[in-house]
Amino acid sequence: MRCLLCLCLCLFVAGFAGCRRQSSAEITIAHEVSPQPPRVGRLLIVLRITSASRKPVMGARVRLEANMSHAGMSPVFAGTLEVAPGDYRANMEIPMAGDWVILVHLTLPDGEKLERQFEIKGVAPA
């Protein structure tokens, strides 16, 4: 009887272990910026968001925030549109030459929020 109870408990715990939520650390965001090299004005930013199993993350809410790498410039914001499963596109107006840090504010379909960042170095004058 004791062995049966132990077996049932082990199966119960194993069942929950298989149902764990995907960790935000397992989300990958790849980015492409055009034109190349980047210039002051409108940039097209395409994000490809995938899970650890390389499946596209669909239905996320994604906003971008661009900040210059030095103080003194107001941030620039842009929304995104999901144009294909896991592919999100934004048009962002970059008003000044220099180095920019892009923050990706991401809300997953289950409501979990996370942030990632990447740099756009050497934005040239228009």
Regions found by a protein language model. Give the residues of each.
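Bacterial N-terminal signal peptides
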Residues: 6-15
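Positively charged n-region of N-terminal signal peptides that target proteins for export
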Residues: 1-4
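N-terminal soluble domains immediately following signal/targeting peptides that reside
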Residues: 19-126
